[in-house]
Structure formats: structure tokens, C-alpha cells
Amino acid sequence: QIISSVALASFLFCLPVGAQEAAKQWSLEECIRYAIENNIDLKQKELEQKSREVDLHTSKYSWLPSVNASVGENFGFGRSESKDGLIVDRNSANTTAGIQLSMPIFDGLKIPNDIAARKLDLKASIETLNKAKEDLSINVASYYLQVLYNKEMLKIAQLQVDLSSEQVTKTEALYNAGKIPVSQLYDMKAQLAKDEVTLTESQNNVKLALLDLAQSLELERAGENFDVLEPENGDAIERYMSSIIPPDQVYDHAVTFKPQIKEQQYLLESQKKAIRIAQAGYYPKLNLSAGYSTGYYHNFGDGDYNNAPFSDQLKNNGQKSIGLSLSIPIFNRFQVRNSVRTARLSITNRELMMENSKKSLYKEIQQAYYNATAAQEKYISSDKSVDASKVAFSYAEERYGAGKSTVFEYSEAKTKYAQSLAEQTQAKYNFIFRTKILDFYNGTPITL
């Protein structure tokens, strides 16, 4: 009788009605994928990654020459010396134009080391983004399982309403036959009303859980058209029971690929390049420079002036130059030495951060392992509790139907059965979540 009621409640709950017919059911994988594509924090980290790409391009282009053009115009007024050595009154204009090139030939290997450092910084930013994606995936999975948990609690609440409604009908028949007092009938109706309140609360909990999940996905205006796909668990729990991996084994694997570890590795290597960049200040620097300039001179005002044509002056006044400049550091107020010392201190700090990241990862894996084993034990215990309370409720139901027990005894047995089902449901989804977290540390994507 109980089994048939459970089946009926589950069937009725799963029927699509009203707005649910148009609701799209999202799988966990779809939710995670959508969240990764639309999460604002991830988009900001993607921009940070693009910024590191720009830094790398800037560093690579440091080898290219710097080319600049210049144009000038000067005016002279009043007395000045002529080409014959005489002081005369005249006004003049002088136009100049030129182009200059400067290119580093050797800079103490600063540029190649800076390029290498920027490449490592870019890789570190990619791992930062990957870590954020992992955290978001776990967060979405948590909300998703909360929806499944609340939906199963709704089924349990519906079952309680169905059982109470069935007993109200039977109690009314007993009362009409004069076998029980009216007080028992009202007690049973009160129990039904209480179960209906619990059902309403469970329905609201499902809506709130769906809202939390939709908001975690940055899904706007989801409303009634958002729902989740309930996976077929089947023998999943049995598989999860045997999938708990020892923490040391998980850590040995996780430390080789987890993004938070790889990020610190890249940042440490980048800091080592920073020492080479600072040490470049000890070496001479060789630069190539070249240029071309020309000009036009023009006298104007009163007087007999012989101004050469503009094109002839530009051609005849041209001047070319090329040269090498060598800068040799002798004393720089210990700036280079202190820069190197600061870089070495930064390396030591990065090494400590690397070690701390590994220890934090191991602690997280240990915690995930013990949480999974504790959840496993709780689920096994709750499963036994359901079996026992189910038998007790069946016995109480038979006694009440035979008129050998009161409404309170029946309600107490039914309440204990409902509590055991709720505890089993909570233990089940907590166990699933904990095992998924442990598997995730071991490199297995979160799926259901």
C-alpha cells in the first residue's frame, strides 16, 4: 500500500502541467557550460588574460627600431649678419624637417628575458582563469544538487499529503460507522492540513533553489521556463560507494595539473626571469641610431635677397647620419644591486607561496576525502533508518485501520517515516556532492 502510494506520488509529481510543459530542463553539464560562458567574473579574468597578451606583444616589439619624424619652423626679425659680414635689417624664416631611427643592439639580455617573463605571466593568467572556472563549476553543481534535493523533498511531502488524505477518507468511514469519536476525525484532518503546509513550503523551496541556480548562471528572466533534468540514479549510489579514492593518491595526481599549482609554478619561473632583467643593468648597452634632416631658408621684407628655390634647398641642405652609442654603467647609486636583491626576495616569497598552495591543496583533498567517507557512513545509516521506520509505519497503519491505535500513534509513526526519508535524501545528495568534489580533485569532470 505504501509502495503504491509512493509510486503514485512520484508519477503525479513528474507529470508536466501548465507552465512546466514549456520549461526547458537543463542538465548539470549544460548549466556549467552556460555559467562559464556568461559569468561576469570569468569575463573580467578573460580581459586580464588579454591584457597579459598585450604585455607579451609589447615586449616582443621592443626589438624593433623606434622611428620618429620632426618638423620645425623658426622666424627671425631685425638686425642680423649677412653672408658678406655686414649688419643689415632683414626678416627670415627657417624650415627644418627630419627623421630619426633608434634601435637597441644589445641591452644585457633584458629584452629576451622580459619576453620570457611575459610568456610565463600569460600562462599564469590562463591558469587563474581555469581555477575560476573550476570554482564556478563546483558552485553550480552545489546549487544543482540543492534543486534535486528539494525536488525529492517535495515528493516526500506529496507522499505525506496523499497518505494523510487517504487516512482522512478511512477515518470518515469509521466515524460514519460509529466506530470512532469525531475527535479522531478532526485530529486526522489537522494532520492533513499540517502536511499540506509542509507541501507548500517544499514547493517554495524548489522555486527558491531554482532561482539560486538561475542566478548563479547569470540567467536573466528565467521565471517558470527554467527547470533541471533529474538524472536516472539507478545504481549510481553503489558506484559512488566504491569510487572514494585515498587522499594521498588524489594529491599525487592533482598536484601535477591543478591550475592553482601551475599558476604558482609559472609565476615562480617568471620571477626568476625578473632577476635576469634586473642583472641586465650591470652590462653595457649598445644602440644604433640613424637620421636624415634638411631645411629651407628664406629672407623676406625690404631688400634685395637671393632666395634659392624651395626644392633646391631641400635637396642641397640634406644631411644623413648614422652611429653607434655604447653606454657603460660605472656607478648607479646601487640601484641595480638593490633591484637584484629585491628580485631574489621576491623569488623566496614565490617559493613560499608555491609551498603554501601545495599544502592548501592537500588540506582541501584531505577534507574532501573525510567529508565523503562521513557522508557515506551517514547515508548507510539513514538507509537502515528508512527500512526500520517503513516497517514501523506499515505496522502502525495496519493497527490504525483495525481501530487498535489512535491518530497520534499513527501520526507519530508517519512523521518518523517522513523524517527518515528526508534524512536519507539529505544524506544521499550530500554523499553525491562530496564524492563528486573528491573526483573533481582527481581530474574527473563534474557530471551526473
Annotate each PLM feature.
Residues 197-219, 386-444:
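Short segments within alpha-helical structural elements
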Residues 20-24, 70-103, 232-242, 276, ...:
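Small/polar, glycine/serine/threonine/aspartate-rich low-complexity segments that form flexible
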Residues 135-253, 371, 375, 417:
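Periplasmic alpha-helical coiled-coil/stalk elements that build and connect Gram-negative outer-membrane
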Residues 20-143, 286, 290, 334-337, ...:
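Short flexible linkers and secondary-structure junctions
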Residues 43-47, 60, 91, 105-133, ...:
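Sec/SRP-type N-terminal targeting helices
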Residues 4-14:
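Bacterial N-terminal signal peptides
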Residues 19-68, 72, 221, 231-269, ...:
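Bacterial Sec-pathway N-terminal export signals of envelope proteins
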